Amino acid sequence: MTAGDTTGAALLRSGGARLRARALESAMDLDPTFGDRHSELTRQALLSDLEAFVDRLVTAIASNDPHAMATFADLVAVRYRKRRISMDDLVTLCEGLRRASAAIVEPGSVAALDAAIDEAITVFKWHRRLAGDARKRHPLLAFIYKGA
């Protein structure tokens, strides 16, 4: 894959565990309640899942195809729903990955990085509308539709 920015992709690939840890820390900084909502075990699972996010981000940047991240986000959305992780938390995780990755790549690669992460965020926001993930239900409506 040499159609895109191979230098930026190589820098991301070399980031390794430190990049993933910084991405999770950045996500927790962006949303202070992130750590309260998720147990340590869930945060460790998200940290290991970030490896797949970074791999797909590397592919998207190396091939100059930001839609690769959108395809990946569409595939993993169901998995996170089953694990009861909200799509808003995945958007926050992507924003943390954006911050951590921007510190590693060269300034010329940031545009491709932003485009790929924006594609994933768009997909997660689309999936957010399903099953009331976007917001908490109103208590009165929850009482009325309790059987539904």
Segments and roles (model prediction):
Residues 1-91, 95, 99-148:
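Core of compact, soluble alpha-helical bundle domains
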